[in-house]
Amino acid sequence: MARSLKKGPFADPHLLKKIEAQVDSEKKSVIKTWSRRSTIFPSFIGFTIAVYDGRKHVPVYVQEDMVGHKLGEFVPTRTFKGHKNDDKKTGK
């Protein structure tokens, strides 16, 4: 289900504050965040945001085609290890 248009996109205020601080200081360092639910705004383009996947922070470089998506879409939380091998041996 999509978010209501009258509500607008969501981004955590602390994340917006960190982006604005880096724009003002003209320094680009990795921004750590736990906010996977934040929508990527056009002002995020060119920044590297380390998004938490439940175990570690994974760096995501924000590009133009990511605008409008959520940060969590680009960092999977589960690692697929493969299915169990069934060793069906005949003979005793």
From Swiss-Prot:
Coiled coil: none
Pfam family membership, one: Ribosomal_S19
GO BP annotation list: ribosomal small subunit assembly; translation
GO MF annotation: an example: structural constituent of ribosome
Origin: domain of life: Bacteria
Keywords recorded for this protein, A-Z: Ribonucleoprotein, Ribosomal protein, RNA-binding, rRNA-binding
Matching PROSITE patterns: RIBOSOMAL_S19
A single Gene Ontology CC term: cytoplasm
Family matches, as PANTHER family: RIBOSOMAL PROTEIN S19P FAMILY MEMBER (PTHR11880), SMALL RIBOSOMAL SUBUNIT PROTEIN US19M (PTHR11880:SF8)
Listed NCBIfam families: rpsS_bact
Family note: Belongs to the universal ribosomal protein uS19 family.
Its job: Protein S19 forms a complex with S13 that binds strongly to the 16S ribosomal RNA.
Protein name: Small ribosomal subunit protein uS19
Species this chain originates from: Leuconostoc mesenteroides subsp. mesenteroides (strain ATCC 8293 / DSM 20343 / BCRC 11652 / CCM 1803 / JCM 6124 / NCDO 523 / NBRC 100496 / NCIMB 8023 / NCTC 12954 / NRRL B-1118 / 37Y)
Species lineage: Bacteria, Bacillati, Bacillota, Bacilli, Lactobacillales
